C-alpha cells in the first residue's frame, strides 16, 4: 500500500477517532495528537479485535468480476487458499476498497531518458534512501507535502517541489523550495515553467490516484476524479443507478475513520431496509444540491465546513454513537492554521478528543527531531 516508513499522521488523531472506541480506551491513557503509522495501525486492529471481526470475514479471496443479473449480483472470485474459481450470488455489494492504490502517472518531456530514479509516491518507502540526494517532488497536495518534508528531515541535499496549478505556499524550511510546474527534463536537469533549473537525482511523482474498479462490470463502476462529493452517489454512498450497490470512502477527505463509520452505519440501514430510498427525482435533486455546493468551495475552511455538514447529516440518519463533530470541525481548522504558521512544527501541537474530551499531551520529542517512529519510542519515553 502507500504507507511508508517514518509516516506519521498528518492530521490530528482527534479528527479521525472512532466514536465507539476511543484512543484513551485503547491505550489506557491520552496520547499525543500525531502518532506514527504503527500506533494508528495498533489502534485500528484493537477495534477489530474488540468486535471479533476477523472470524466474520473471508480472507484470501480475489474478486474477478461482479455483474448484476436477475435482481442479484453475480460474483466470480478466486479462493486463493485452494486456488479455485467460484461463483456466488449476493443481494447487495459494498465497495470499500479505497481509492489511493492505483497511481496516476503523467508524462513529462525527457522522462524516458532521465538517468536518475523516477517513482510514484505509492512506491515511496524510506526517506533515508535519498540522503544527500537532490530530490524533485511533483505535486501540491498532502502526499507531496509529507514526502518532501520526510526527505528534508532525513537528510536530502535539496528538495524542490513542482506544482501544476496552485502552490501550497508554506514557509518551507532550509533546503526546500516550491516552483511552478515541471516543463521538461534534460539529462539530470529539471527545467520548470518559471525558468528554474535544478539538478535531480530522483523524481517522486505525488500526482494522485485513480478510482479503479476492474472487478466491477462497466455499468457498475464509479467514474470520478478525487473530489469531496463524487457524482452518482446518493448521500455519498448509494449508487444512483442501482440502490443495491454501495460505495464507502470514495470522497476526497478531511474526515476519515468516523466519516467512513457514518457511511457504513447508513449503508447497513439501507441494506436492512431501515432506510428507504426516495424517488429517482429526489435522489437526483439531492446529489445535484451537494455537487453544486462543492463546486463553490474556495478554501480549506469552506471544504472542512462542507464535509463536516455532510458527515453530520449522515450521522443524524443512523444510530452511530455520539461524537462531537463541532469539535472536530474546530480541530481541523486549527490544524490548517498551524500548518500555515509553520509547516515543520504543526505536528507538535495538541488537540482535544471529540469522544472523551481528554486533551492530548505534547509529544516528548518534536516531530522534526523524532527519528524513531516505533510505537515503543512514541509511547514509552
Task: Tell me what each language-model feature is.
Residues 1-22:
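Conserved N-terminal glycine-rich FAD pyrophosphate-binding loop of Rossmann-like flavoproteins
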Residues 1-6, 27-283, 295-381:
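Flavin (primarily FAD) cofactor-binding/catalytic cores of flavoenzymes
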Residues 282-290:
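Post-kinase regulatory C-tail/linker adjacent to protein kinase catalytic domains
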Amino acid at each position: 500500500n502507500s504507507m511508508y516508513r517514518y509516516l506519521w499522521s498528518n492530521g490530528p488523531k482527534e479528527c479521525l477517532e472512532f466514536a465507539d472506541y476511543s484512543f484513551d480506551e485503547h491505550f489506557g491513557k491520552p496520547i499525543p495528537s500525531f502518532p506514527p503509522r504503527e500506533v494508528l495501525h495498533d489502534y485500528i486492529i484493537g477495534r477489530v479485535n474488540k468486535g471479533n471481526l476477523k472470524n466474520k470475514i473471508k480472507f484470501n479471496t480475489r474478486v474477478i468480476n461482479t455483474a448484476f443479473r436477475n435482481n442479484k449480483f453475480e460474483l466470480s472470485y478466486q479462493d486463493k487458499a485452494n486456488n479455485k474459481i467460484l461463483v456466488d450470488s449476493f443481494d447487495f455489494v459494498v465497495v470499500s476498497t479505497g481509492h489511493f492504490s492505483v497511481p496516476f502517472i503523467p508524462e513529462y518531456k525527457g522522462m524516458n531518458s532521465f538517468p536518475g530514479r523516477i517513482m510514484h509516491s505509492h512506491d515511496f518507502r524510506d526517506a533515508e534512501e535519498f540522503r544527500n540526494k537532490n530530490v524533485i517532488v511533483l505535486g501540491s497536495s498532502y502526499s507531496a507535502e509529507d514526502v518532501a518534508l520526510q526527505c528534508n528531515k532525513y537528510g536530502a541535499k535539496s528538495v524542490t517541489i513542482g506544482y501544476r496549478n496552485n502552490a501550497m505556499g508554506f514557509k518551507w524550511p532550509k533546503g526546500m523550495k516550491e516552483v511552478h510546474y515541471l516543463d521538461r527534463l534534460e539529462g539530470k536537469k529539471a527545467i520548470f515553467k518559471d525558468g528554474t533549473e535544478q539538478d535531480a537525482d530522483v523524481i517522486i511523482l505525488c500526482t494522485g490516484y485513480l478510482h479503479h474498479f476492474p472487478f466491477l462490470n462497466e455499468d457498475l463502476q464509479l467514474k470520478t476524479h478525487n473530489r469531496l462529493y463524487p457524482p452518482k452517489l446518493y448521500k455519498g454512498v448509494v449508487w444512483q443507478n442501482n440502490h443495491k450497490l454501495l460505495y464507502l470512502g470514495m470522497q476526497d477527505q478531511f474526515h476519515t475513520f468516523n466519516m467512513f463509520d457514518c457511511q457504513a452505519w447508513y449503508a447497513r440501514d439501507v441494506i436492512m431496509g431501515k432506510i428507504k430510498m426516495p424517488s429517482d427525482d429526489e435522489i437526483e435533486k439531492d446529489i445535484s444540491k451537494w455537487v453544486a455546493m462543492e463546486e463553490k468551495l474556495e478554501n480549506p475552511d469552506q471544504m472542512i465546513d462542507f464535509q463536516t455538514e455532510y458527515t453530520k447529516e449522515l450521522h443524524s440518519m443512523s444510530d452511530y454513537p455520539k461524537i462531537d463533530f463541532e469539535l472536530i470541525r474546530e480541530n481541523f481548522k486549527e490544524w490548517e492554521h498551524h500548518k500555515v504558521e509553520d509547516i515543520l512544527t504543526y505536528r507538535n501541537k495538541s488537540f482535544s478528543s471529540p469522544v472523551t474530551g481528554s486533551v492530548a499531551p505534547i509529544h516528548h520529542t518534536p516531530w522534526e527531531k523524532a527519528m524513531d517512529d516505533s510505537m515503543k519510542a512514541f509511547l514509552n519515553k
